[in-house]
Regions:
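Carbohydrate transferase catalytic cores enriched for Leloir-type hexosyltransferases
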Residues: 2-373
Length: 373
């Protein structure tokens, strides 16, 4: 079938030019499944098309479009609509925000609207801009997706969209791959100068609750047995964490390591070398890191708040209320003392069944199959 007789689907991939992040994982996982459908032609657009080709491969039903405009606002307002017109696109898929000029059907995935339920964790101007641009984008779109039942419900509540299908994040196959734990721990120790460590991978911002871990780490005297390792980009200042950290004895500070932003390869190494993964976030639209840790066979404890309440049926006693410090300490101490009590292999099977890109792609494909040229 020739490409001009197929349904043409445009996918905005500008996030692939900005380094590793959750939205990139979502687009990559979703469309690696969807491009298997040869009845549709997919147009992936970004500044670095060589990077896109390395990720999605060369297929007859895939075209890579280069963004020659790097200004984000002009690109959204005019350049994307021009590309859509030029290539006769039937459906375009965006994340959070869509162009106001509309020349085809729009799909938008709004991953969360946490700034509405947890405004204290977001700058005021950012909240206002996000609210109005998300709301306008949702109204302009023919279908609005989200990534969890929790996020879907909040998009419905705050943006006034009656039906928000869920396209759940999947876990990349690389996390399920077998590996030698002793070897990974040795490599992590050599590369990062860390050993026998508790790990938290997440961006730095107040709602991520890093301060909860460091406080319990000190009060439970876990520094006598473990290092505490953080990894993630600094998004918003966490003054509560900084204030507490500065009060710690130097001997304890030496046991707290911040690796900062890591490449995917280094992140995977740090994860595989961990003794215990801890995820105390207060609010998430999905919350994928604890699932990735479980998939990698790492004993994991997690917050049970917001979207992470979906994990309770299989994580059970290894979850906690991130706003209840004593409850968190109890779960952390139990897991740190006996991480082998967490049945990682059983949990891994649950993750593989519940969170895979085939399920998410099926939801999007169902909508695409209703679209006529």
């Amino acid at each position: 079938m020739e490409s001009n007789k197929k349904l043409k689907v445009f996918v905005d991939c500008h996030v692939f030019d900005e380094g590793f992040q959750g939205i990139r994982t979502y687009i990559e996982g979703l469309y690696k499944e969807l491009i298997k459908d040869d009845t549709k032609h997919f147009y992936f657009a970004a500044g670095n098309t060589q990077n896109l080709a390395a990720i999605f491969g060369h297929r007859k039903n895939v075209t890579f479009l280069k963004y020659h405009i790097h200004n984000k606002i002009f690109r959204l307002l005019a350049y994307m609509p021009w590309l859509i017109l030029k290539h006769g696109i039937n459906v375009a898929h965006f994340q959070y925000r869509v162009p106001p000029l509309k020349f085809c059907r729009y799909m938008v995935t709004i991953h969360d609207v946490l700034f509405e339920d947890y405004p204290q964790y977001f700058p005021k101007v950012s909240r206002k801009v996000s609210y109005y641009t998300y709301k306008i984008s949702a109204k302009l779109s023919d279908v609005v997706f989200s990534v969890s039942p929790y996020a879907s419900g909040t998009v419905t509540k705050h943006l006034g969209i009656k039906k928000v299908p869920v396209t759940p994040n999947g876990i990349d196959d690389v996390f399920f791959e077998p590996y030698d734990k002793a070897s990974m721990r040795h490599k992590a120790a050599e590369k990062f100068r860390i050993k026998n460590y508790l790990l938290y991978i997440s961006r730095w911002e107040p709602r991520k609750n890093q301060q909860l871990i460091i406080k319990a780490f000190y009060e439970l005297k876990l520094y006598e047995r473990y290092d505490l390792v953080f990894a993630g980009e600094n998004t918003f200042a966490n003054t509560e964490y900084d204030t507490y950290y500065n009060t710690l004895p130097d001997a304890v500070k030496q046991k707290v390591i911040n690796l900062g932003r890591l490449s995917f390869t280094d992140m995977l190494l740090a994860l595989r070398g961990a003794r215990l993964f801890v995820y105390p976030s207060i609010a998430e639209g999905f919350g994928i890191p604890p699932l990735e840790a479980i998939a990698a066979g790492i004993p994991t404890i997690s917050s049970n708040a917001t979207a992470m309440a979906d994990y309770t049926p299989f994580m059970g006693q290894w979850q906690f209320d991130p706003c209840n410090y004593n409850a968190f300490k109890e779960v952390l101490l139990k897991a740190a003392n006996s991480p082998e009590l967490i049945d990682s292999e059983c949990l891994k099977k649950e993750i593989k069944t519940r969170y895979n890109w085939t399920l998410a792609a099926g939801v999007v494909k169902k909508y695409l199959n209703t679209v006529t040229k």
